[in-house]
């Protein structure tokens, strides 16, 4: 049995739809899967047990990447062809069953939206597949003892909580007698985000574990999964953290938590008092701008939410 699954180019979107892929695999244990996605998201699928291959999409002019993908898939007969990108590709392939994300429902979470494509109910939670090699690499990086993971970057500055706030939070959560007393602090981010994380890393000093663009995504994901708590901006790594099962606290302002809050029993979020629309309405928003829209979120608010989340997770694990 052959299944084609076209996933997102983006880490976060690919992660949020991973539960649909995992549920397909659970329902069809004999199937072999071809996953098509962008280079950034491809490592998320490397350790999927039933994956036969990954086709990495390279965006081309005039959407020619879709024609290139069609050329690489048209010779196969697919038992199931699923397109989470919403293109028309599946209609030009030989398949027993075709499904595509035709439109977004902006009133529900992206996990629920993804589940609609194949009618899965309840919506399957995102799944993080980790290889033994990635786990070993993460163990070597983090070692033993408690770890606080911080996702202090994002794809634009408006979604980034100020680094001085992350530093104050880390100091409060790891102080003597605190919920993560003495924990080391791992800071995560992607390639090209080093400048955004530099002030935080400098403030943490010797206790910092710098994982901002220093390791591949699979290793970063495995390292996040080893942490005791993840606190981060709305980003792909936040969704990776939630899928791993680590207690995950997301920080929201100019993105909608109805669609993008971290998904799972061990997840929570804090957002600005102002809505996404209100934040955009009161500023002269320019893509790529250099100002944070999360400055109104107090350190004390995030600290309290983090402590409550961690206590709840520990209570449920006991």
Residue ranges and their predicted role:
Residues 1-318:
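Catalytic machinery of carbohydrate-active enzymes
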């Amino acid at each position: 049995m052959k299944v084609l699954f076209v996933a997102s180019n983006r880490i976060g979107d690919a992660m949020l739809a991973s539960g649909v892929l995992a549920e397909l695999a659970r329902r069809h244990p004999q199937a072999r899967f071809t996953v098509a996605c962008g280079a950034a998201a491809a490592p998320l699928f490397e350790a999927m047990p039933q994956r036969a291959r990954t086709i990495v999409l390279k965006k081309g002019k005039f959407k020619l990447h879709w024609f290139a993908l069609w050329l690489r898939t048209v010779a196969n007969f697919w038992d199931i062809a699923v397109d989470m990108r919403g293109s028309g590709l599946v209609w030009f392939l030989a398949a027993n069953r075709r499904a595509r994300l035709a439109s977004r429902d902006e009133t529900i979470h992206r996990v629920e939206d993804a589940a609609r494509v194949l009618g899965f109910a309840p919506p399957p939670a995102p799944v993080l597949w980790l290889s033994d090699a990635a786990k070993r690499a993460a163990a070597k990086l983090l070692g033993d003892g408690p770890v606080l993971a911080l996702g202090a970057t994002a794809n634009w500055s408006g979604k980034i909580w100020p680094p001085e706030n992350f530093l104050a939070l880390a100091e409060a959560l790891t102080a003597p007698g605190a919920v993560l007393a003495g924990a080391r602090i791992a800071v995560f981010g992607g390639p090209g985000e080093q400048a955004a994380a530099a002030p935080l890393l400098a403030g943490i000093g010797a206790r910092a574990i710098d994982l901002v663009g220093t390791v591949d995504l699979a290793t970063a994901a495995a390292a996040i999964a080893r942490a005791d708590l993840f606190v981060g901006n709305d980003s792909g790594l936040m969704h990776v953290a939630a899928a791993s099962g680590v207690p995950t606290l997301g920080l929201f302002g100019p993105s909608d938590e109805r669609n993008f809050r971290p998904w799972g029993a061990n997840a929570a979020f804090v957002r600005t008092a102002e809505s996404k629309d209100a934040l955009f309405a009161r500023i002269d928003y320019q893509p790529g701008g250099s100002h944070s829209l999360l400055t109104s979120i107090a350190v004390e608010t995030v600290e309290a939410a983090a402590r409550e989340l961690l206590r709840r997770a520990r209570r449920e694990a006991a």
